[in-house]
Each structure stands twice: as C-alpha cells, then as structure tokens.
Design a protein with these regions (language model features):
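Compact, glycine-rich, soluble single-domain proteins
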Residues: 61-66, 70-107
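A short, structured loop/turn motif at beta-sheet edges
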Residues: 115-122
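Envelope-exposed proteins and targeting segments
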Residues: 52, 82-84, 108-110, 122-124
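Solvent-exposed, acidic/flexible segments
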Residues: 34-42, 59, 76-79, 134-142, ...
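C-terminal partner/receptor-binding element of secreted or periplasmic proteins
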Residues: 126-158
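Bacterial N-terminal signal peptides that target proteins for export
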Residues: 1-10
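N-terminal signal peptide c-region/cleavage motif recognized by signal peptidases
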Residues: 18-20
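Terminal, regulation- and interaction-focused segments at domain boundaries
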Residues: 23-63
Length: 158
C-alpha cells in the first residue's frame, strides 16, 4: 500500500508539473542552451534566484524520479541525464498578480527548470514557462514576472 501511494504521489506530481507544459505551445516556453556541467548550472540557478531575493520553496529532481519509476510505467530508457525544477514566489509580485485578477493564482509558484538529455550530453537547457493572460492588468504584472524569470535564465546562460 505504501508503495502504491508513493507511485500515485509521484505520478500526480509529474502530471501537475508537466501536463501544463504539454498544453502550451513551445513558443511560450523560453529556453537557452548552456554548454556547462549540470552541477555548475544548478549552482548558478540557485544563486541567480537567491540574488534577486527569492527563496526556493521546492527543488524537484524530476529526472531521478522518472528514472526510479521507469520500469513501473513500462519505460525502458532515460530521456534525461539530469532534470530539475526550482519553484519560488515573490510575495510582492504575487500579491500584485492576484489583486488584479484572483485567477492569476494559477501562475504561482514561478518555476525555472534545467535539464540535460541523454541524446545531447554536455548541453544543459535552462528555461521557464512564459505567462499569458487575457486582461491588460494581468498581462502587465505577468510581463514583470517574466522579466525576472528571463533575467535568471539569461544570467545562468552567460
């Protein structure tokens, strides 16, 4: 029972993390390639987030989880050498975001991701999911949040 519960929890986490990505076009995902060791990129991401005053509230090692559960879901290979996400928020920006439209809670937390594929070792892809909204007030604050996320990714890629 404990094993089944752990698998269900892992599946729900993956579904909640990656299914929204599948629902958006690739043009709404901003990525940059970094030719660097994954561990160096990881440290750069964590520093770039912290240097802007954000606090990571969850760090997910998605690649490890996918490898650990591969046989359980009928997979025989690995997509990633490493794949991780960092989730964080800003009380100031998030407050502005939900005050203009309460549904904008869907955009919190912010997520930066990094992965290195088995097929392209030595290149780490760093990025974030760009935000979009229907109303102008939401677009304005979401654009400000995207600017912060883009600056994190660009700093890591330098």
């Amino acid at each position: 029972m404990r094993y089944t519960r752990a698998l269900l929890t892992a599946w729900l986490f993956v579904a909640g993390t990656f299914l929204p990505l599948a629902a958006v076009s690739s043009s709404s995902i901003f990525t940059l390639d970094v030719v660097e060791e994954f561990d160096n990129v990881r440290v750069d991401i964590e520093n770039a987030i912290a240097n802007r005053g954000f606090v990571v509230d969850f760090h997910a090692k998605i690649g490890e989880m996918l490898d650990r559960t591969a046989l359980d879901v009928g997979s025989t290979g690995s997509v990633y050498k490493r794949a991780e996400t960092w989730q964080f928020c800003s009380s100031i920006l998030s407050r502005k975001m939900v005050e203009v439209n309460p549904v904008n809670i869907a955009y919190c937390p912010y997520i930066v991701f990094a992965y290195e594929t088995v097929e392209k070792p030595g290149t780490v892809v760093v990025g974030y999911r760009q935000h979009d909204a229907d109303d102008d007030a939401s677009k304005k604050i979401l654009s400000e949040i995207d600017d912060h996320l883009a600056s994190i990714v660009q700093e890591v890629a330098e």
